[in-house]
């Protein structure tokens, strides 16, 4: 049995793993539960996520990646090791080649941390590739042609925006404004307006079920429960789409500005291609209601959501591993 090539989308919110010949075989939250007293890892992924906010004092649920980069090296390594062992892709004789994605503007120290975590969890050769490039490939864009393609990849910790041509990034921007910040903004809005404390999972729920960033695009209501800050007792309130648009207005504007900045730095010939082809949205944040309409209105170009936007990066790693020998050597650090 030979080891298989594996592609990893190491996200702030989720880890997805693509195995050559099998497709996406793992999609779990990037969460690790540890015992605070002993430092022992108790659970990883889905099991650990279900413990968030519901554990006794000695058990903490940690998200080892923050804003697209490793915040806790040892725990990231433990998490990767757990996921790779779960797949059983290592054979007795050989270790797998791993392609792992990172945001466009991370430092060489942060790159080294990602590479080492992957090597220690059992990779033979570890390739690093920039996330928006891999997302574009996974979304089916022809990035190796001499024409302009623009991708906006909205993850949990970062939004990566890039214009690509001839298989490389022409202009790009990576900002720490993405899904997690939207959740926090909703949580703070409810706290300010209703004096009600809610958890991260509730605010994500609100975002998905009633949230929109395009004014008037949605009118739904949701009943939520939390703890009253005045009485300390549980209380139920109803929130509507309009309030969430208000709460997320400034955050959405940050993404719009970053996308405008990338377009402004794009050579005119490539800009013309983007007007024809449109901008492709990938990542979990592409599913945020109204983000496509908002970007289309502000950028004055067509905006399309990729098919299965959450899977684009993982699928892209698979395609890149198939063609690893044809890729520019400079890209594979």
Curated annotation (Swiss-Prot):
Cellular component GO terms, alphabetical: cytoplasm
First-listed, main subcellular location of the protein, grouped into a coarse class: cytoplasm
Alphabetically ordered keywords of this record: ATP-binding, Cell shape, Cytoplasm, Nucleotide-binding
Positions of disulphide bridges: none
KW ATP-binding (keyword) present: yes
Molecular function terms from GO: ATP binding
Superkingdom to which the source organism belongs: Bacteria
Family matches, as InterPro entries: ATPase_NBD, MreB, MreB_MamK-like
Subcellular location as annotated: Cytoplasm
Protein family: Belongs to the FtsA/MreB family.
SUBUNIT field: Forms polymers.
This protein's name: Cell shape-determining protein Mbl
Source species: Bacillus cereus (strain ATCC 10987 / NRS 248)
Gene symbol of the encoding locus: mbl
